[in-house]
C-alpha cells in the first residue's frame, strides 16, 4: 500500500455546489464541488467532497432540455440540501459564514477533501471578498426580451413525460432568437459572445472565463492510500468541473438575462461544449429563476450545480444576508412550494444553526404582538373606510391624536441582536451599524424568520418582539407619553397637549429610561449573556415638535404618518405622497374643525404634481411598496427581485429595474390611488365629505399633463 501525497491550505469557503450522485462498489455517493479562496490569494480554487448516501429518488439527474424542472427534480434538489445538513465534512463547509476560515487537507492527485478544521484565532487577518464578474445578456427577438408578456396566473404547467413541472415552467421552453453576452472580470478581462442561434452546436469559447479541469476521484478510499492490483481504479469516477478564471467568485448579471432566458441559453451552450465528449459522470444543471415560483420571489436565483459558482442579479434590493455564502445559496427553495418553509432546512437557509438545540431565554414572554404588526392605537382611530366586502388590506384605517411632541423609537437593531443570539445564528446575517450595516437589511432578515422559520423560531421571535415592545412602552409611560402607532419594529408615541417637552431632552430621557430598565437588563442577560446593553445603544429615537395634530392611516396594508413635516422637497419614491398628504392636512389650523377648503385642496393637488414630476422617468420611483406586492402576489402576480411592479391602465404588472420608465406606465393610476387615499382620510375625519367637482377636473388635467412626459 502506497501513500498518496496530500496538501494543506488555509482558506475561506466561497461556494458549495452539488455535482451529482453516482453508484459504485454497491453504494451511492454524493459529490460536491467546494469553491475556496486561500488567504493572500485572489483566485478561486476547487476541492471535491464525497459522502456515502442512501439511494436518492430517481438516481442521478441528467441536465434538462429546458429550464423547467419537474416536481421530482425539485424534490431531488431539496433532498440534496437536507443531505448537506446530515453531518460530515460537507455540513461544516455548507454552514460556513462568509468570513469563516478553515484549515483544509486534501489529496493532491484528485483534490478530494480529507479533513477540515475551523480556525478559531484568525490572527488579525482581514477578510476581503473577491469582486463579482459583471455579466450582461441581451436576448430574445425584439428588444432584449421586452416583448415578453407577463406570465399568466394559473396552476402547474403542462405535463412533461408524465410529471408536473413547476409553475411558469414553459417560460424558457423556447430559446431566444438572438444572444449577445458581455462579461467583464474584476481584472479588466473582457469576454464577448454573439450568435443568432443560441442552440448552435458549435463550441463556445468560454475558457477565458471558466477553466475546465478533470479529476479522477477515488470515491471509496479517503485515507490517502491506493489499493492493490488497480482495484482503486474501478472505484474512481471522472469529474469535469469549471474553475473561475479572472479573480472573481460569482457572477452579477443584469435582470434581462433572467427574464429573457438568455443566461440559461448561454450556460446551456457552455454545458454542451464542455461535456460533449466527457465520458464520466455529468453534473446537474439548473438555473432556478425566481419567476419559477408561483408568486415570484425576492430571493436570488439558485444554481445548485453547474457552472459551480453563485449567480446574483441586479435587483431592486439585495439585503446582505441573501449573499452570505455558502449557506444562503438556495433561499429560493423557500418560495418553490416544496414544503421547505417552516422546516429546520428553512432555518438553516436563513442562517440559523438548526442543529445546535441550545437557545437561551427559557423565560421569554409569550407572543402578544407579531413582529409584522401595523396598528394604530384604537383610542385614536376615527373610523374605517373602504370598499364593500373588501378584505383587511382594502380597508383604510385613519387615526388622529393630539400631540405637542412626537417620539419615534426604532428597535430594529436591538431585536436583531436578541434574535441573532437567541436563535443561534451562524455569524452575523447582516453587518452591524458600526460596520456600515443597514437597518432595512436587518428588518428583511427578521421578516423572513417570521414568514419562513419553524414554529419554534416564529414563537421565539414573537416573544422577543413582545418583550422589547413592553420595555419601550414602559419607558414612554414613565415620561407621560402614550403610544400612537406601531409599524413593525418602530413604535410612535405622542405627548399630550398639556405637556411642552423639548425634542432633544425628551429623546435623551427616553433612551435613559430604556437603559435603566430592569426588564431590559434581564432580557439582555437572559438572551445574550455577557453582551448585555451592547445592542440597546443602537435604538434609534427621533423626537420632534408636533403641529398639535398627528394623523395616521393604514392604506393598502402600509402605515403612513403625517404631522412630522419631513417631506419638504421632491419625493424619492411616489408613495411618499401619502405621508406628505397627511402632513398637509395636519398642518391646517382648522384640521380638527372643518374639512379643507377648495383653495387648500387645489394647492395640495398642484404641489403634489410638482413633487411627483422629477421622478417620472424612473421605474424605481414608481415601484409599488412591499405591502402592496404581498397582496398582489396572493392574487396571483409573479414578481422576482430583479423587477419592480408598476401600474398601467390595465392594472399592476412587472417591469425591470432599469433607468427609463416604461412607456405603458400610467400616472393616472397613481393619482387615482392618492386621491382615493385623500378622500378616505378626509371622510374619516369629516364624515359625509365629498371632493368638489372642480378639484376632480383639475386633477384630471394635471394627470394628463404629467402623462405627456
From Swiss-Prot:
Query: What is the name of this protein?
Result: DNA helicase/primase complex-associated protein
Report the function annotation for this chain: Component of the helicase/primase complex. Unwinds the DNA at the replication forks and generates single-stranded DNA for both leading and lagging strand synthesis. The primase synthesizes short RNA primers on the lagging strand that the polymerase presumably elongates using dNTPs. The primase-associated factor has no known catalytic activity in the complex and may serve to facilitate the formation of the replisome by directly interacting with the origin-binding protein and the polymerase.
| Species for this entry | Epstein-Barr virus (strain B95-8)
Going by the UniProt record, its keywords in alphabetical order are: Early protein, Host nucleus
Location (main, coarse): host cell
Q: Which GO terms describe its biological process?
A: viral genome replication
InterPro entries in the cross-refs: HSV_HEPA
Q: According to its UniProt record, where is this protein located?
A: Host nucleus
Annotated family: Belongs to the herpesviridae HEPA family.
The UniProt entry's GO CC annotations, sorted and at most eight, read: host cell nucleus
| Chain residue ranges for the region called Disordered | 141-176
**Subunit composition and interactions:** Associates with the primase and the helicase to form the helicase-primase complex. Interacts with the origin-binding protein. Interacts with the polymerase catalytic subunit.
Top-rank lineage group of the source organism? Viruses
Amino acid at each position: 500500500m502506497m501513500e498518496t501525497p496530500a496538501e494543506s491550505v488555509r482558506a475561506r469557503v466561497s461556494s458549495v455546489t452539488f455535482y451529482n450522485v453516482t453508484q459504485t462498489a454497491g453504494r451511492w455517493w454524493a459529490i460536491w464541488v467546494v469553491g475556496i479562496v486561500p488567504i493572500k490569494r485572489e483566485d478561486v480554487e476547487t476541492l471535491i467532497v464525497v459522502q456515502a448516501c442512501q439511494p436518492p429518488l430517481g438516481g442521478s439527474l441528467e441536465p434538462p432540455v429546458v429550464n423547467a424542472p419537474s416536481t421530482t427534480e425539485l424534490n431531488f434538489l431539496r433532498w440534496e440540501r437536507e443531505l448537506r445538513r446530515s453531518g460530515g465534512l460537507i455540513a461544516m463547509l455548507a454552514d460556513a459564514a462568509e468570513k469563516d476560515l478553515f484549515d483544509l487537507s486534501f489529496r493532491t492527485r484528485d483534490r478530494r477533501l480529507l479533513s477540515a478544521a475551523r480556525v478559531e484565532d484568525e490572527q488579525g487577518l482581514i477578510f476581503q471578498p473577491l469582486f463579482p464578474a459583471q455579466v450582461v445578456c441581451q436576448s430574445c427577438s425584439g428588444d432584449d426580451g421586452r416583448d415578453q408578456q407577463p406570465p399568466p396566473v394559473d396552476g402547474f404547467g403542462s405535463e412533461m413525460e408524465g410529471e408536473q413541472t413547476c409553475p411558469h415552467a414553459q417560460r424558457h421552453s423556447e430559446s431566444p432568437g438572438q444572444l449577445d453576452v458581455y462579461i467583464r472580470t474584476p481584472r479588466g478581462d473582457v469576454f464577448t459572445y454573439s450568435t443568432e442561434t443560441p442552440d448552435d452546436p458549435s463550441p463556445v469559447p468560454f475558457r477565458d472565463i471558466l477553466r475546465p479541469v478533470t479529476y479522477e476521484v477515488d470515491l471509496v478510499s479517503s485515507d490517502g492510500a491506493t489499493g492493490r492490483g488497480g482495484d482503486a481504479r474501478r472505484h474512481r469516477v471522472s469529474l469535469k468541473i469549471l474553475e473561475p478564471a479572472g479573480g472573481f467568485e460569482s457572477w452579477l448579471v443584469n435582470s434581462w438575462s433572467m427574464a429573457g432566458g438568455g443566461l440559461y441559453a448561454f450556460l446551456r451552450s457552455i454545458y454542451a461544449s464542455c461535456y460533449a465528449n466527457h465520458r464520466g459522470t455529468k453534473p446537474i444543471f439548473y438555473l432556478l429563476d425566481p419567476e419559477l415560483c408561483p408568486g415570484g420571489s425576492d430571493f436570488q436565483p439558485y444554481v445548485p450545480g453547474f457552472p459551480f459558482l453563485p449567480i446574483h442579479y441586479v435587483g431592486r434590493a439585495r439585503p446582505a444576508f441573501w449573499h452570505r455564502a455558502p449557506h444562503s445559496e438556495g433561499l429560493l427553495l423557500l418560495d418553490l412550494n416544496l414544503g421547505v418553509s417552516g422546516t429546520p432546512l428553512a432555518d438553516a437557509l436563513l442562517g440559523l444553526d438548526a442543529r445546535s438545540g441550545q437557545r437561551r431565554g427559557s423565560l421569554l414572554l409569550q407572543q402578544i404582538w407579531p413582529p409584522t404588526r401595523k396598528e394604530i392605537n384604537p383610542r385614536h382611530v376615527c373610523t374605517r373606510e373602504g370598499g364593500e366586502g373588501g378584505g383587511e388590506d382594502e380597508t383604510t384605517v385613519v387615526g388622529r391624536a393630539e400631540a405637542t411632541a412626537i417620539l419615534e423609537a426604532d428597535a430594529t437593531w436591538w431585536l436583531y441582536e436578541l434574535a441573532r443570539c437567541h436563535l443561534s445564528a451562524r455569524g452575523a446575517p447582516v453587518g452591524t451599524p458600526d460596520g456600515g450595516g443597514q437597518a432595512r437589511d436587518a428588518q428583511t432578515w427578521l421578516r423572513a424568520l417570521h414568514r419562513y422559520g419553524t414554529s419554534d423560531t416564529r414563537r421565539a421571535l414573537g416573544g422577543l418582539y413582545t418583550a422589547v415592545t413592553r420595555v419601550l412602552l414602559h419607558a414612554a409611560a414613565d415620561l407621560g407619553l402614550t403610544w400612537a402607532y406601531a409599524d413593525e419594529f418602530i413604535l410612535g408615541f405622542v405627548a399630550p397637549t398639556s405637556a411642552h417637552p423639548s425634542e432633544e431632552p425628551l429623546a435623551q430621557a427616553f433612551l435613559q429610561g430604556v437603559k435603566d430598565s430592569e426588564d431590559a437588563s434581564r432580557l439582555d442577560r437572559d438572551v445574550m449573556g455577557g453582551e448585555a446593553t451592547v445592542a440597546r445603544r443602537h435604538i434609534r429615537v427621533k423626537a420632534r415638535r408636533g403641529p398639535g395634530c398627528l394623523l395616521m392611516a393604514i392604506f393598502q396594508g402600509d402605515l403612513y404618518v403625517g404631522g412630522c413635516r419631513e417631506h419638504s422637497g421632491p419625493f424619492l419614491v411616489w408613495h411618499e405622497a401619502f405621508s406628505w398628504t397627511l402632513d398637509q392636512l395636519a398642518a391646517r389650523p382648522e384640521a380638527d374643525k372643518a374639512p379643507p377648503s377648495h383653495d387648500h385642496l387645489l394647492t395640495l393637488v398642484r404641489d403634489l404634481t410638482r413633487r411627483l414630476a422629477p421622478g417620472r422617468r424612473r421605474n424605481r420611483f414608481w415601484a409599488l411598496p412591499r405591502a402592496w406586492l404581498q397582496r398582489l402576489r396572493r392574487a396571483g402576480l409573479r414578481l422576482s427581485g430583479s423587477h419592480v411592479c408598476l401600474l398601467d391602465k390595465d392594472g399592476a404588472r412587472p417591469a425591470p429595474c432599469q433607468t427609463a420608465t416604461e412607456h405603458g406606465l400610467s400616472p393616472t393610476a397613481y393619482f387615482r390611488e392618492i386621491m382615493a387615499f385623500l378622500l378616505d382620510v378626509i371622510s374619516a375625519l369629516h364624515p359625509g365629505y365629498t371632493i368638489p367637482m372642480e378639484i376632480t377636473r383639475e386633477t384630471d388635467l394635471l394627470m394628463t399633463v404629467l402623462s405627456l412626459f
